[in-house]
Amino acid sequence: MLSFSQNRSHSLEQSLKEGYSQMADLNLSLANEAFPIECEACDCNETYLSSNSTNE
């Protein structure tokens, strides 16, 4: 009986992990659809930061 309980618990845990993984993938794909344009401000900020570090 104990092994059945452990097996069921493991199976449930595996199902939850797969479900969370699928939800994360879905969230990423929805975010990519919602914001397809790359952030220009972020790119400018990276350029600014990298140019500052080379000047020092």
Swiss-Prot record:
For this UniProt record, the keywords arranged alphabetically read as follows: Toxin-antitoxin system
Q: What is this protein called?
A: Antitoxin MazE
Q: Does the keyword Cytoplasm apply?
A: no
Quick check: keyword Lipoprotein in the entry?
no
Role played: Antitoxin component of a type II toxin-antitoxin (TA) system. Labile antitoxin that binds to cognate MazF toxin and counteracts its endoribonuclease activity.
Tell me what induces its expression: By heat shock and by exposure to sub-MIC concentrations of several antimicrobial agents such as doxycycline, erythromycin and penicillin.
What is stated as this protein's family in its record?
Belongs to the MazE/EndoAI family.
Q: Which InterPro entries match?
A: Arc_rbn_hlx_hlx, MazE
